Amino acid sequence: LLRLTPCHDRLQNVISSELTVSVPTQSRDYEDVFGNRVRRLAIDNPFSEMVIESKSVVEVLDVDPLGFGPLRVTSAFPLVWMPWQRQVLDPFLLPPELPESELAELAEYAMSFVKRNESDLLDTLLDINHTIYREYQYKSGSTNLATSAFDVYVNRRGVCQDFTNLMICLARLLGVPARYVCGYIYTGPKAENTRQGEASHAWVQLYLPEVGWKGFDPTNGILTQTDHVRVAVGRNYIDATPTSGTIYLGGGPETLEVDVRVDDLEP
């Protein structure tokens, strides 16, 4: 499965997109349950190398990330949603499967942000976002796909995927729907973002009352704007991973190399 075509919606306009694979395949394109554009490949012939190349031109609309006034009120935590809202939001409200003791400690950690921000929803979420950026060390190779949100909390280090998983967990424990976003980030000379510029990037989208989904990037301590290009979203990394697949026959040692380049096209 390939999730390499950027999202197309009211905030992100895909002007052109091309996805090529260097070996013969049978392919089928479809939209998954999260609205991601997916290409399913079937490869029958052996190969020693496969190159997957995705090129897209995307217009990301510039909007004020803090232009939502209704949130400047105190809230009761965890947030309570109407039954018809929960039908849609439930997949993004379930905390990860962790021991009760670990979830309890993470819930206490999440509530500490609520208390020091006097139950203001937006200030609480901004505080969590910036605290992860400020107090957690970005260290490649320090974690793997099995690293839990609690492990990241205890060890205070990781990469964008780990910081995203931690913020998703904390938000859900506060009753805030949270989803995993995989995409790209522009880190050119005019951009203030400095981490994760040469590979795919991960961040969080939180569903805010009377506002909708808003992007938070705890790796860089910012809200997402025109420097972030969304490619796929889901409940977690597995739902949004750029590539995945299964070898049914044969197989052997394998390596994966990823190269990402994001350029700013002048109008």
Can you name each region flagged by the protein language model?
Residues L1-L79:
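Intrinsically disordered, low-complexity N-terminal segments that are enriched in acidic
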Residues L4-P6, V21-V23, N36, I43-N45, ...:
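Generic structural "secondary-structure junction" signal
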Residues L11, L61-P65, W213, Q225, ...:
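Intrinsically disordered, low-complexity acidic/polar segments
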Residues Q26, Y30, D64, S75, ...:
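Glycine-rich, flexible loop/turn motifs
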Residues S54-S56, V204, V258-V260:
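A structural signal for short, well-ordered beta-strand segments
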Residues V58, L208, V262-D264:
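Short beta-strand segments enriched in hydrophobic/aromatic residues
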Residues V73-G158, L166-I168, R235-Y237, Y248-E266:
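Secondary-structure boundary elements
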Residues H130, D162-G250:
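Hydrophobic/aromatic-rich core segments of domains that either
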